[in-house]
Amino acid sequence: MKVTKGYADYITFLFDDEQGSPIISNLLKEEVLIEKCICRVVDTITGYYEKRIEIKDSVILRLDMYAAYIYGGLTITNSVIGYFRLMDGGYNREPIIIRNCVFLGEVDFDESVLKNDIIIEDCIFLKGHDFVEDIRYAVMKEEYFKVKI
């Protein structure tokens, strides 16, 4: 799934089988790329993401990844995010990489379980970085915690 160069009011990841029948399994098997977009809301819906989700060079008012199992990992680079929630999810088999971003609002990792590296570098958090303790509790091994704020 690829969304590039433009404005989208609402992006959500819907699940269906090969015949287009509605939600049989909530496993998305393809990579997701959101690039050079301006979007009001990106909502992952509760689901399982086998491949990497990548957001780059974008502006997103609300990035809501509630109960998203991001097995393939997540990369957010060179973007401005209003509100970001990765809550009650995680379970990443691949790294979560957040680099060169500006976060305008709350950042929420509450109740996530992180099973691989989480790398946060060169980001600005206008509402502070209280969420760092949530990440520290979420990582399954201390060496996965690679946050430089």
Language-model regions, residue ranges each:
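N-terminal leader/targeting and pre-domain segments
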Residues: M1-I149
